[in-house]
Amino acid sequence: QNEKLKEANTQAAVRAGHSSTSGRNYGDSGKIILVFSPKGGSGSTTLTTNLGVALHSEETPVVVVDGKLQFGDLSFFYNQQGPNNVTDLAPRGNELDHQVVEEVLVVHESSGVSILSAPPQLERSEEVSGVEFSQILKYLRRMFSYIIIDTGSNLDEVTLAGIDIADLIVLITTQDIPAIKNVRLFMNLTDLLGVDRNQILFLLNKFDKRRSINADRIGDITKQTVMGTIPVDEKFVIPAMDRGIPFIIENPSNSVSKAVFKFAEVLKERIAENDQVEEFELEN
């Protein structure tokens, strides 16, 4: 077991980039990925945590942003808490610079992923408006290749701001009927908002092949193709979560970890495809 953990940490260290993003400037090319599930308990924070590790490298630095401003616990999933949080950036949205942002971010030591935490006090969640949240995300585009936002199941001002600015929405469901029903409601809303369906990457989480409803059936019901499945393995996922260790680091060869790595590749391919379409439309 110790050898497996050592191997996993070694692989994570290879994937990890520099702790600091000073001097980096990506223009406005960083991609904003919003992780959303319209039903609580579907695993959005767990996915955000591990997807961040899967996408991060020295060439493609990642920041994860806790958009659950009232009850966010993203930093605990990395076991990496700092003294500052998103409310320290919100009032300075028009005057952000790399140094100011880096003072607020916390870097996960074993992966290199940067973390922008939610406020620890419930009452402080009201200090961040949707406009201010958008300003922060736009600035993070200059510093990181991927900005991954973990959001709650409520469509509050901050989540709607994230949907509006996101390059890609990772929409999570499970095999539960209420979750699938809520996905249909969310898809109806995004259609009304004019969100291109190619900007939505549909993921089936906690997949149990013993259950009668499968990915194809869910795709038929929601009229959105399921682009990835993460198998259920609570005996593997929950202990790692309780220790504050991304499971993708603890054991990258587990089937759940492999599924996250595979989904990360699907995500990168979709972003590249959407970029090509956008370039073609601009040229014509």
Language-model features, listed with the residues they occupy:
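Conserved catalytic-core segment of NTP-binding enzymes
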Residues: 127, 131-234, 239
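Flexible beta-alpha connector loops of hexameric P-loop NTPases
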Residues: 87-92, 122-128, 177-178
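Acidic-aromatic/histidine active-site loop/patch
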Residues: 1-32, 192, 200, 269-284
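Hydrophobic/aromatic-enriched cytosolic interaction surfaces used to assemble or bind macromolecules
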Residues: 87-90, 225, 258, 263-284
